[in-house]
C-alpha cells in the first residue's frame, strides 16, 4: 500500500485518529497503539499544553512515534482559529494545523468564509494547513488554490455517525484535487471508512467512532483494517458494475 504524503512528510498509516472523549487515558493510549495511526489530532483548547500540573494525554505518549495535528476546535471566526493555531505552534509540538471554524453550533458544519480567511492567514505564517470543510466542490477548489496542504471534507456532521451522505460530491473533490483529500467527520463504522477509501480518499480522520464505541480498542483495530482494505481495493481497481451477470467459469465443454 502506498504512503500518505502531506506537506512533504510521508506517513505509513492513512488513518488519522482523534484523541478526545475516551473513557480513560489507559483506553485512549491502547486504542491509539492498536490503530497504528501516525497522525494524532487534538483540540488545543482541551489540552493543558502549558499547565504542567494538569493531566495531559500527550504525556502518556512516546511523541517520537507520532506526528501531532492540533486543531482549532471551538473557533467560530478566522481570528479565533488563527489565535489558537499560534498557541499550538508556540508549544513547539508541530507546525501542522487542522483549521476548524464552526459556523453552526447545532449542526457543527464549518463556516466556509471564515475557513478560507483563516487558512490564507496561516499559510502566510508558514503553517502546514489542513482545513476541515464541507463537501462543497467549489470551496474545496478555492482552498486548494490558496495553497493548503490537504483538503478535509466532512462525510456528515461531526460526531453524527451518519457516514458518507454525499459520495458524489466527495468523488468530485477527490477527482479535482492535486493535494491529499482526508475524509473527516461523520464516520460511524468501519464500513464508512472503507467506503471513503474506495472512493479514492487519501485518508480518513475519525474520533467519536472509536472513542464512543462500546470497546474503543477493538473499534480502533477495525478502523485500521477498514482503511487499509479500502485503500487496497482502490489501488487494485474494482470490477465495473453491470446490469446482467457474467459467468466466472469457462464456457468450454458445456452442452450446446
UniProtKB/Swiss-Prot annotation:
Its main location: cytoplasm. InterPro entries: Aldolase_TIM, Thiazole_synthase_ThiG, ThiG. The active site is at residue 98. One of its GO terms (biological process) is thiamine diphosphate biosynthetic process. It is found in: Cytoplasm. 1-deoxy-D-xylulose 5-phosphate binds at residues 159, 185-186, 207-208. It is an enzyme of class 2 (transferase). One of its GO terms (cellular component) is cytoplasm. The keyword Transferase applies. Keywords: Cytoplasm, Schiff base, Thiamine biosynthesis, Transferase. Pathway: Cofactor biosynthesis; thiamine diphosphate biosynthesis. It holds the Pfam family ThiG. It catalyses: [ThiS sulfur-carrier protein]-C-terminal-Gly-aminoethanethioate + 2-iminoacetate + 1-deoxy-D-xylulose 5-phosphate = [ThiS sulfur-carrier protein]-C-terminal Gly-Gly + 2-[(2R,5Z)-2-carboxy-4-methylthiazol-5(2H)-ylidene]ethyl phosphate + 2 H2O + H(+). Its EC number is 2.8.1.10. One of its GO terms (molecular function) is thiazole synthase activity. Changing residue 98 to A: No activity; no imine formation with DXP. Homotetramer. Forms heterodimers with either ThiH or ThiS. Catalyzes the rearrangement of 1-deoxy-D-xylulose 5-phosphate (DXP) to produce the thiazole phosphate moiety of thiamine. Sulfur is provided by the thiocarboxylate moiety of the carrier protein ThiS. In vitro, sulfur can be provided by H(2)S. Belongs to the ThiG family. HAMAP family: ThiG. This is Thiazole synthase. It comes from Bacillus subtilis (strain 168).
Amino acid at each position: 500500500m502506498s504512503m500518505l504524503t502531506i506537506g512533504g512528510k510521508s506517513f505509513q498509516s492513512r488513518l488519522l485518529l482523534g484523541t478526545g472523549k475516551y473513557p480513560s487515558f489507559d483506553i485512549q493510549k491502547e486504542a491509539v497503539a492498536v490503530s497504528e495511526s501516525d497522525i494524532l489530532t487534538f483540540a488545543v483548547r482541551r489540552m493543558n499544553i502549558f499547565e504542567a500540573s494538569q493531566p495531559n494525554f500527550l504525556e502518556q505518549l512516546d511523541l517520537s512515534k507520532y506526528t501531532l495535528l492540533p486543531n482549532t476546535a471551538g473557533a467560530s471566526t478566522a481570528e479565533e482559529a488563527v489565535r489558537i493555531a499560534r498557541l499550538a505552534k508556540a508549544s513547539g509540538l508541530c507546525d501542522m494545523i487542522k483549521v476548524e471554524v464552526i459556523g453552526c453550533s447545532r449542526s457543527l458544519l464549518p463556516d466556509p468564509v471564515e475557513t478560507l480567511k483563516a487558512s490564507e492567514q496561516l499559510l502566510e505564517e508558514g503553517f502546514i494547513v489542513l482545513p476541515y470543510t464541507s463537501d462543497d466542490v467549489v470551496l474545496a477548489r478555492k482552498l486548494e488554490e490558496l495553497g493548503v496542504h490537504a483538503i478535509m471534507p466532512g462525510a456528515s456532521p461531526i460526531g453524527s455517525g451518519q457516514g458518507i451522505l454525499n459520495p458524489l460530491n466527495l468523488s468530485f473533490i477527490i477527482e479535482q484535487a492535486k493535494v491529499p483529500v482526508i475524509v473527516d467527520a461523520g464516520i460511524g463504522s468501519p464500513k464508512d471508512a472503507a467506503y471513503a477509501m474506495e472512493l479514492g480518499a487519501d485518508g480518513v480522520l475519525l474520533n467519536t467512532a472509536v472513542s464512543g464505541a462500546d470497546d474503543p480498542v477493538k473499534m480502533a483495530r477495525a478502523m485500521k483494517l477498514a482503511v487499509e482494505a479500502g485503500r487496497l481495493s482502490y489501488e487494485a481497481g474494482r470490477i465495473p458494475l453491470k446490469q446482467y451477470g457474467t459467468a466466472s467459469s469457462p464456457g468450454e465443454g458445456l452442452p450446446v
